[in-house]
Amino acid sequence: MTQLAIGKPTPLGAHYDGQGVNFTLFSAHAERVELCVFDANGQEHRYDLPGHSGDIWHGYLPDARPGLRYGYRVHGPWQPAEGHRFNPAKLLIDPCARQIDGEFKDNPLLHAGHNEPDYRDNAAIAPKCVVVVDHYDWEDDAPPRTPWGSTIIYEAHVKGLTYLHPEIPVEIRGTYKALGHPVMINYLKQLGITALELLPVAQFASEPRLQRMGLSNYWGYNPVAMFALHPAYACSPETALDEFRDAIKALHKAGIEVILDIVLNHSAELDLDGPLFSLRGIDNRSYYWIREDGDYHNWTGCGNTLNLSHPAVVDYASACLRYWVETCHVDGFRFDLAAVMGRTPEFRQDAPLFTAIQNCPVLSQVKLIAEPWDIAPGGYQVGNFPPLFAEWNDHFRDAARRFWLHYDLPLGAFAGRFAASSDVFKRNDRLPSAAINLVTAHDGFTLRDCVCFNHKHNEANGEENRDGTNNNYSNNHGKEGLGGTLDLVERRRDSIHALLTTLLLSQGTPMLLAGDEHGHSQHGNNNAYCQDNQLTWLDWSQASSGLTAFTAALIHLRKRIPALMENRWWEEGDGNVRWLNRYAQPLSTDEWQNGPKQLQILLSDRFLIAINATLEVTEIVLPAGEWHAIPPFAGEDNPVITAVWQGPAHGLCVFQR
């Protein structure tokens, strides 16, 4: 039997050098680490890793080749009260594995035990890691590096975006390949999108609870192997990496960036009753935030929280991010529950992972977007991230919905959100683009559902409608559900137009949820994380071409307005913005706080957004000059000069002079 050589302690993971494979694994508390390799017949061969450099265990297997399947058995104490849960009866996934073979099924053998260890061997059913060799021709690929001020983000799910697209070949729908298909790229280009933000593509598992109900984790926020692509989105699992890179290369050629939603806050091992896949059995005490009683700090709502202040975990997370940039040429990241990244355990802007990213010549050059909260005390950190980060702006989301759908927001508060929420983000040398403005996202109502439902309808999720937020700031316009009279449909359409216009013509970085531009509905489900079906897949055959054209026209209009593209904070008298009342006069303090919901926003001295958010048709006197309505609010031919706009109830219009 071949013996392992000592090998070397870096880099982490399994790496083929042309003559064999070097294996490395971090564990500060292990007493012994076995490398387990499996031949074509599934026969297991075990090797003790002979090298032990600090907290890194390592060994070199001569003559090993790409395609080799492997895992680890890690020996150490079973001391739950101290946070140690070693169990060598369980085969473990390499945290840095780049491909996984097998499925993460709900099986008692994939659990280590709660108070007492489960010593039943699980190698026969446990997923295995696969050694991967990296040879890929990027040709002349170069990142688009779209300036933040010019960025338009489109948030989409790999499968849901294309699975029902009639113009994409059936055999590649719902896959990485489909993202790079000319039909999809042309659509994004015509819409005006500059960055495609993908929900998680790293290998994830469906929670046992969902599997027992016949459901699955659709969104992917339950990671198990952060370096490996989720194989279900590939035409062939063996070629997933190349399929993904082909798509990125094609998108880059079209000038479209790719941003990955990445989950560094927790793992699919969940709470202490959850499965044992990897980190818990490798070094539970180091990888997770552990309470004094040995249980987990659950600051994520998912059962556990990664300890991103531990030096080894910081190295692991940093290596993971660098891998996606260097190996896959991604252009940035959106970090789920990103407040966890700054916990020490209190949140700090100079937390170790933030500092590592700031000092990394690779990671400091890509787009970084934070979901700036977690569920722990002190977890709401909107506006408090380091300068390199942009942040999801929930202030904007709630303000836009309240203004147009609940009618209870003063003009001053609305204007503050329209101006990139400068009260929140204008600090630490940050620019307006730090505010990622959104009206909807993957979690919550779709845009159409915002105007069709007053209440969530999540019964299909199997939690008796308890899941999902109740604070939707939605308005069904008088009837719960889709459909209705022509008048109802038109009023809902007008509200959608108003929300889209507010999103796409505000200062800051706009993010559009895929499907909102053509009226996608989830039938009132505002937490469709476990709905891998027609509820979430975009139905292109039912798409509203009129709404799509309206959205595209708004995006292209945005690109013509210097005040929105220059990414500079607006200052009084700089010519970027003027705020006027219905008579084209500056608003008084009382009007800002208590006045009627009528406002004119003059941008770059040439573009005028006239707003009447009252219940009555109102005459709006435009500023001096020859004004004409412009697309998408009027045709391009034969512009009509006007000095007064008869503003319909809850309406708006954009003019140019």
From Swiss-Prot:
Enzyme class: hydrolase
Domain of life: Bacteria
Chemical reaction(s) catalysed: Hydrolysis of (1->6)-alpha-D-glucosidic linkages to branches with degrees of polymerization of three or four glucose residues in limit dextrin
Site (Transition state stabilizer): D443
GO MF annotation: an example: hydrolase activity, hydrolyzing O-glycosyl compounds
Example of a GO biological process term: glycogen catabolic process
Main function: Removes maltotriose and maltotetraose chains that are attached by 1,6-alpha-linkage to the limit dextrin main chain, generating a debranched limit dextrin.
Family note: Belongs to the glycosyl hydrolase 13 family.
Protein name (database record): Glycogen debranching enzyme
